[in-house]
Amino acid sequence: AGARSYFSLKNAISDLLEFDYFFPTHQGRAAENLLFSAIVKEGDILPGNSRFDTTKAHIEYRKATALDCTIDEAKDTQLEIPFKGNIDLEKLENALKSYPKEKIPAVVLTVTNNTAGGQPVSMENIRETSRLCQKFDVLLLIDSARFAENAYFIKTREKGYSDKSIREIVREMFSYADVMTMSSKKDAVVNMGGFLAMKSEALWKKCKIYCILNEGFITYGGMSGRDMEALAQGLEEGTDFDYLESRIKQVEYLGSRLDEFGIPYQRPAGGHAIFLDAKKIISRVPAEEFIAQTLAIELYLEAGIRTVEIGALLADRDPVTRQNRFPELELLRLAIPRRTYTNNHMDVVAVAVKNVFDRRNNIRRGYEIVSEEPIMRHFTVELKPL
């Protein structure tokens, strides 16, 4: 409970992100659990851009609502704009006006926007979101799993930031936030860990008991000393420009190979993955038979490539009606592990996708559910082919 690595991590978070208070946690979803246990109650509304699975599940588990205010342009996979992950500020302001402050514990801004295809959020959008939160006296929570990739896109795509370092951009991003959650297996380049950080001592005290109850004492939160030390180092390495550029260029390379074959995906290429547009690839499969999951299975059978469906299966059932929810996008995420594969591996992946694409007209049926859990079903669901 008194490992020196705790202080290494505390200093790294303070120096890079400028948050004074934090809890180590064993994963990002644990950080969400601590925070939402303290601030979210039944009937609450949490507006923001698209929430990924665990964030949305933690909100809905508490009988609250995750309100998606992502810009409409994100729904057009072939439209190329630089910041497709942005919050629609008009939608957000309308939401903040429509509900009493007591019903809105936080606005949740996810960077990058994973559900929309790994798409970044601009600094201007972060700044204006913060301005609205201050106007309506609501916390701004940044879900920060891929904050460094988001900073890279700000540097390379947004006017006025090309001469700033990644770390300078990161500090400005988080200067607008009140609280952040971090799944460190992403941009902190480690295999375990996360944290919850905030600027308010009062909020830290409110969350403290939930850390002890669910994770461990406040100076380790379910993490070993080794993991905290690695995380502190990972925050340093993960914000190195050359590292980020090599990673994101590999994602772009896979996208360029798919372009050669005419395969549609969410454009422009995201920071950590290519997201195939499953609706356009296997258009004959009915929505209720899980289009993107069908494509995931086809690609696995073709070449043993393991991907993740971001479609109706992940969208889960409506918590009130228990009917399947059918999102406008059915995406298949080809997430690329860090510091692992060469471009030759990307060539293999691209050809495998092409092979499935070439026989797309023969894929007419999908899958039905045999058994599922009442929440976050996509992790353990059992399916059978139709």
Residues covered by each model-derived region:
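Active-site loop ensemble at the mouth of alpha/beta enzyme cores that anchors a bound cofactor
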Residues: K279-R306, V320-P327
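Conserved glycine-rich beta-strand-loop-beta hairpin in the small C-terminal domain of fold type I
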Residues: Q250-E252, Q266-A278
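N-terminal "arm"/small-domain region of PLP-dependent enzymes with the aminotransferase-like
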Residues: A1-A3, A12, A335-R339
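Short, conserved charged micro-motifs
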Residues: K205, S283-I291, R339-V348
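PLP-dependent enzyme catalytic core of the Aspartate aminotransferase-like
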Residues: G238, E302, L314-L386
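Conserved PLP-enzyme active-site core in the AAT-like
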Residues: R4-I263, P286
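A structural motif shared across PLP-dependent enzymes of the aminotransferase-like
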Residues: A1-S8, R317-P319
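Flexible, glycine/charged-enriched surface loops at secondary-structure junctions
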Residues: I218-G225, L244-R247, G262-A269, I310, ...
